[in-house]
């Protein structure tokens, strides 16, 4: 039976608090302070156990400051006081623009920031009750971890049926939607009475310009008390004086835009999370979901991939809508913000290390690295996609060999910034002239990510120097003959098919692509995905067939390299460990690869 008296349009009715009670007179209730302390210890332990590095644990604690019980409520009460009228004059002006109400005076202060995660749940009707209960536990855990969740319920089939004008009254569909809102709210309440949820209808109104917040306090009040707002996708139309169903994606877009206008020291939207029965964005290559999507670089390619016909059209449209909605929302947020798309079953996983939502809050990374080669058996298939607005990526490639000075003069790269990136990453000074003498004219590829946050320089190295030189001489003669024929008006033959297929280019029998420099700014190392973006560009786009590299045996990054390599070999009598990966690696040349890795002289000198 629908409990319509609990919530009405334009109001937010508080729901009863659950209190701890004992089942028998012989047992004693756990004191709130002790319970809060135990929860805090458990949370800190989960952070330290789940974060892969000390840096990730430190970043999480500094950002989210996990608090429980009374501590959590006090912190968020202070934050909402700032939201409703505290702080600098400029802050007050921006808050007034957001809420439509002037602040009412200095009520308190807090040094923290409200860290918001907007969660959209689609097709709730298809989700089993036990999964909804477990999802409620995940949402409650997010709150205890210092995140402030806002749940947006998708109207789904109810909205589609209403738009088809099947003659049923609006109230019929309103009830169906509110049933979904209550179902999610009850799951959160059951999971954690201390956190609790607040179902909200009447938060939005709309006119010809779009959505607006009709009563901002309905959202801010539960947030201030550590409660989880669960929003119905309903809005009052100021033009027609009717309440209407709205798209959940439009609600996510609007909320993100408006909350992004709040000063960052008061409120920050950190995560956009879509829980969808179809899961993450599907990948042809992975036979599962894309692990990570750098939207600035990959959006158009992935949209085109979804039209390849490997999934039914109805599913394709849902994935495209999710991709578009994520892109629109993340554009309003800082680069550190991220989006997640996963299934209800995965969102319900209780394990911290396996639940991608919880894991991403703790580490700011996907459960597995996106740069793990797809063809390796140790790379699992996932149903979750992590998305960021991301960073632009510059890629240069040449079969004959690039020259760093020439590319700098052309404006394709900034060599000074590239030097700085390499030295900052390695903590050593680079002998520039020595390096240029070695690599110029033999650079196979250059990848630069973001604002020179990460880069890779790949060179062509001779497997058999004599035969390699013969090949280069033959290529020069062929080029000269082709130029002479063209000048004489003789038509040139069509290029071989492999030249049109890109990654199907056969391996040069006398050369190998060698990762000479792989650098990431120290401030971008760890969870920013820069290393993954660069490495993925090398092994999945530029050089998918074969890539060779070396690393000092004591390099702490070697574990990361081991996970991404097809094989490795510690070279006896040297300080080097050799790695190789790719679809068509030539293990028969390993002895010659060892020669390459041992004969290259380092260009990095003394420590900075």
UniProtKB/Swiss-Prot annotation:
Pathway: Amino-acid biosynthesis; L-arginine biosynthesis; N(2)-acetyl-L-ornithine from L-glutamate: step 1/4. Pfam families: NAT. GO terms for cellular component: mitochondrial matrix. One of its GO terms (biological process) is L-arginine biosynthetic process. It is found in: Mitochondrion. Keywords: Acyltransferase, Amino-acid biosynthesis, Mitochondrion, Transferase, Transit peptide. Residues 402-604 form the N-acetyltransferase domain. Its EC number is 2.3.1.1. InterPro entries: AceGlu_kinase-like_sf (IPR036393), GlcNAc_Synth_fun (IPR011190), Vertebrate-like_GNAT_dom (IPR006855). Gene3D superfamilies: 3.40.630.30, Acetylglutamate kinase-like. It catalyses: L-glutamate + acetyl-CoA = N-acetyl-L-glutamate + CoA + H(+). Its main location: mitochondrion. PROSITE patterns: GNAT_NAGS (PS51731). GO terms for molecular function: L-glutamate N-acetyltransferase activity. It is an enzyme of class 2 (transferase). N-acetylglutamate synthase involved in arginine biosynthesis. Belongs to the acetyltransferase family. This is Amino-acid acetyltransferase, mitochondrial. The gene is ARG2.
């Amino acid at each position: 039976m629908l409990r319509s008296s609990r919530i009405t349009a334009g109001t937010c009715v508080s729901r009863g608090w659950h209190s701890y009670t004992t089942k028998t007179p012989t047992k004693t209730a756990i004191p709130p302070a002790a319970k809060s302390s135990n929860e805090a210890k458990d949370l800190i332990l989960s952070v330290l156990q789940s974060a892969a590095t000390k840096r990730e644990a430190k970043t999480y604690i500094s950002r989210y400051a996990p608090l429980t019980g009374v501590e959590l409520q006090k912190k968020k009460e202070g934050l909402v006081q700032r939201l409703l009228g505290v702080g600098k004059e400029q802050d007050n002006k921006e808050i007034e623009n957001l809420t439509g109400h002037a602040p009412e005076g200095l009520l308190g202060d807090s040094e923290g920031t409200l860290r918001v995660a907007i969660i959209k749940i689609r097709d709730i009707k298809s989700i089993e009750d036990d999964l909804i209960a477990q999802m409620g536990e995940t949402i409650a855990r997010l709150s205890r971890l210092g995140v402030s969740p806002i749940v947006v319920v998708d109207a789904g089939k109810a909205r589609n049926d209403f738009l088809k004008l099947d003659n049923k009254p609006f109230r019929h569909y309103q009830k169906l939607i509110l049933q979904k809102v209550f179902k999610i709210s009850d799951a959160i309440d059951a999971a954690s009475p201390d956190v609790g949820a607040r179902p909200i209808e009447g938060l939005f109104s709309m006119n010809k310009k779009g959505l607006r917040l009709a009563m901002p306090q309905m959202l801010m009040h539960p947030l201030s008390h550590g409660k989880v707002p669960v929003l119905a996708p309903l809005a009052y139309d100021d033009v027609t004086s009717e309440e209407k169903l709205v798209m959940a994606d439009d609600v996510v877009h609007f909320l993100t835009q408006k909350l992004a206008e709040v000063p960052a020291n008061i409120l920050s939207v950190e995560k956009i999370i879509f829980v969808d029965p179809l899961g993450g964005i599907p990948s042809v290559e992975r036979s599962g979901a894309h692990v990570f999507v750098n939207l600035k670089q990959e959006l158009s390619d992935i949209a085109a991939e979804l039209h390849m016909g490997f999934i039914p059209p109805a599913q394709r449209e849902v994935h495209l809508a999710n991709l578009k909605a994520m892109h629109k929302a993340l554009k309003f947020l800082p680069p550190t913000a991220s989006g997640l798309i996963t299934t209800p079953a995965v969102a319900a996983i209780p394990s911290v290390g396996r639940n991608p939502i919880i894991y991403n809050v703790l580490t700011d990374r996907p459960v597995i690295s996106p740069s793990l080669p797809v063809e390796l058996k140790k790379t699992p298939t996932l149903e979750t996609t992590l998305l960021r607005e991301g960073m632009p990526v510059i890629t240069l490639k040449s079969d004959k060999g690039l020259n760093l000075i020439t590319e700098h003069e052309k404006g394709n790269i900034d060599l000074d910034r590239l030097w700085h990136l390499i030295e900052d990453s390695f903590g050593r000074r680079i002998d520039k002239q020595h390096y240029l003498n070695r690599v110029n004219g033999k650079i196979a590829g250059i990848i630069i990510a973001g604002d020179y946050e990460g880069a890779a320089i790949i060179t062509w190295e001779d497997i058999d120097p004599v035969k390699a030189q013969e090949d280069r001489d033959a290529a020069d003669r062929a080029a000269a003959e082709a130029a002479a024929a063209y000048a004489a008006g003789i038509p040139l033959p069509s290029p071989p098919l492999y030249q049109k297929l890109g990654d199907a280019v056969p391996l040069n029998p006398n050369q190998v692509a060698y990762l000479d420099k792989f650098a990431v700014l120290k401030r971008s190392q760890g969870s920013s995905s820069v290393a993954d973006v660069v490495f993925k560009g090398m092994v999945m786009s530029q050089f998918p067939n074969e890539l060779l590299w070396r690393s000092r045996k004591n390099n702490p990054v070697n574990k990361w390299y081991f996970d991404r390599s097809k094989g490795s070999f510690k070279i006896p009598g040297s300080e080097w460990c050799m790695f190789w990966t790719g679809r068509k690696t030539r293990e028969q040349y390993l002895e010659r690869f060892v020669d390459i890795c041992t004969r290259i002289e380092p260009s990095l000198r003394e420590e900075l």
